[in-house]
Amino acid sequence: MAFGSKILNIGSKSDEYNDDAVPLDQVEEGAQERRYYLGLTKREFKLMMLAGVGFFLDSYDLFIINLVTPIFEYLYWGGIEKGPTGKGHYPSGIRGLVNASANIGNIFGQLLFGFMGDFFGRKFVYGKEMVIVIIATVLVIAMPKSIHSPLSKMMWVFCWRWLLGVGIGGDYPMSAAITSERSKIKRRGTLISLIFAFQGFGTLAGAIVTIILLGCFEHPLNREGHYHKLEGVWRLQFGLALVPAIGVLIPRLIMKESKSYENSKALNSAEGKDPKAFFNTDDEDNMKKSSSHGDSEVVEASDRYANQADAADAEVDNIEKQFAAVTTPENSSGFITYFRQWRHFKHLLGTSVCWFLLDIAFYGVNLNQSVILKNIGFSTGTNEYRTLMKNAIGNLIIAVAGYVPGYWFNVFLVEILGRKWIQLQGFVITGLMFAILAGRWNEISTGGRFACFVIAQLFSNFGPNSTTFIYPAEVFPARVRGTAHGVSAALGKCGAILASLLFNFLTGVIGYGNVMWIFCGCMWGGILFTLLLPETKGRDADEIDRLELFYGKDGKVQCDSKWKSWYFNGIF
């Protein structure tokens, strides 16, 4: 056949096991590696730690502000009930802005790093986000004592936590793409979920660190009433995040490029072009024969290639490889061209809107959990120290009982139940908990409201909080994965910002019960947009992408009956 000698094995996962081009089915079924930790191979374990520690740090940095907020109130605004002059307190607008600062930065980081990851490559980008996180953290805790105005102090924190958010945001699309491209398809969901589950440990660590620090300062705070010592507490709360950040910096900077990404770049130039233009007449005839399963021409081809188990598939594979070899990357136009088609855009719409609706409720609760605990009567004490300690203990209980277990339910069940079912049931049950809180806010006891929040956290993290991260990593092909994941996550952070800025205002205007109705509506709205998404369990987005280029619209779908179902393929 009239082809060049260079062969590119597009979409193969072989780069994670050896340097030779190995067919995907051989990698999936034939590569046997011993499993050690949590059922993972050594390579999977290293990947989990490298990306997972990043998510531990992300969660710690994002949600520690919830535990620092009461300290800011006592230290700079004279307490919760009244300010230094007896006429005010920590303004809800300023509090919301400071709480939202990292999430605002997230949007820029997710879009910027997602695009750069697709355009320049994963290696070029990965690790740079951690440099930003380290610099921003140092600047936050270096707030000079020469700043006297409480408002100026909060603006200092806001500015550098915004920069911190840029770095954290960049970690989302890059870690998701790298994990997806270096995982076996049958274990991909579990590994991505496992890495994302480190967020639970980050939130848990924030509560534990706060309790330990308050315990260390117990004598000057509780017995002597020297509350200016809280200055050291909040700086340590923020500053301890430097430990994991520095630990993963070098390994990220020296990580090699994913061959799955390198190979996928060639497909961008194929979008919208006729593959036949790259082959001669004989090649064109062979491709037609290979795409006609079951007819007489395939039988003739099988006779000519007696030494091959399936001549048609071998011919298609050969043509796909050669076609990739003669193409060149055009990453800048690939994203727009790909999502110009509704069958692709509906997936981006589903992942983005589901993430947006989830984060309105998720961050509305988590960034204001200390305020909610005080309102339901849990975090009250005889003095400031005891109030802060009870608040930290309340956050710890919610993390242990609902937050962390939810992630691990997802880890163990994501490959059994599938992504779509888990996301649907999570939206339903979390919405139900918010409905109960909304309808009976004033009637339910403190323990009852606390239990509802724990259950909501459990099913939120088991369901949509995990699957909204998994979906963009699996449903989009590698050539647009980083940008698409960044867009989805950025829209989610828009929801988080809305919740951060408006929660305190709305609770003062319409009350906590009506705010819970808003959260309930967001959860049940997520059910509708989940229906746009396919089930990605066992789905190879890169393979489907290649087959669509060769066989036209829904080429893969027509060859596999299970994708004909609305449930597996999504509505519309």
UniProtKB/Swiss-Prot annotation:
Gene3D superfamilies, per the entry: MFS general substrate transporter like domains (1.20.1250.20)
Q: Which cysteines are joined by disulfide bonds?
A: none
**Phosphoserine modification, residue list:** S12, S14, S292, S296
Q: Where is the composition biased (Basic and acidic residues)?
A: 286-296
Q: Which GO terms describe its biological process?
A: monoatomic anion transport; phosphate ion transmembrane transport
- Classify the source by domain of life: Eukaryota
For side Cytoplasmic, which residue ranges? 1-47, 121-123, 175-193, 251-346, 417-420, 471-485, 530-572
Keywords, comma-separated and alphabetical: Membrane, Phosphate transport, Phosphoprotein, Transmembrane, Transmembrane helix, Transport
Extracellular topological domain residue ranges: 69-99, 145-153, 215-229, 368-395, 442-449, 507-508
What is the topology of this protein in the membrane according to its UniProt annotation?
Multi-pass membrane protein
Positions of region (Disordered) = 265-297
Main localization category = membrane
Identify the CDD domains for this entry.
MFS_PhT (cd17364)
**Where does this polypeptide localize?**
Membrane
Instruction: Quote the function comment for this protein.
Output: High-affinity transporter for external inorganic phosphate.
Which family is annotated? Answer: Belongs to the major facilitator superfamily. Sugar transporter (TC 2.A.1.1) family.
Spell out the protein name for this chain.
Putative inorganic phosphate transporter C8E4.01c
Taxon lineage: Eukaryota, Fungi, Dikarya, Ascomycota, Taphrinomycotina
